[in-house]
């Protein structure tokens, strides 16, 4: 009986340790996108993110200024849509999914999210044939500052 109990205890502890190590590596893949009702490139970015394995819901607004201001996105960092993860991070604009995943894994102190300001040609949702431009993915910080997180080349 004691051997059964010890085996049970060992299995329980092993599963507990295993599941906690798995939980630390899970990337949150749920986004709520705030956009205007007529924006076609926003719809394309949502489709792209869905194809990348994200669960995406969209909410249409006639004016996004209040939402962007609420989430701390100053005018210099704005784009046509604002995505918010279930854990509160913001992803402004046409950000490639690989950088969102990298950002979520790194857990950068004082960061509120990422931004691709404007609508760079060739970014996800802004495809136009073979035309592409180089652009930066910025980390946005609580104090309103930013720094380059990645540069996406042609």
Predicted segments with their positions:
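Active-site-proximal beta-strand/loop segments in catalytic clefts of secreted hydrolases
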Residues: 34-36, 59, 94, 117
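Local sequence-structure signature of Cys/Sec-based thiol-disulfide redox active-site neighborhoods
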Residues: 24-52
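N-terminal, post-signal-peptide region of Sec/Tat-exported proteins
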Residues: 46-87, 93
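Thiol/selenol-based redox catalytic cores and closely related redox-interacting motifs
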Residues: 76-154
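Positively charged n-region of N-terminal signal peptides that target proteins for export
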Residues: 1-6
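Bacterial Sec-dependent signal peptides at the C-terminal "C-region" and cleavage site
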Residues: 15-25
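Bacterial N-terminal signal peptides
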Residues: 7-16
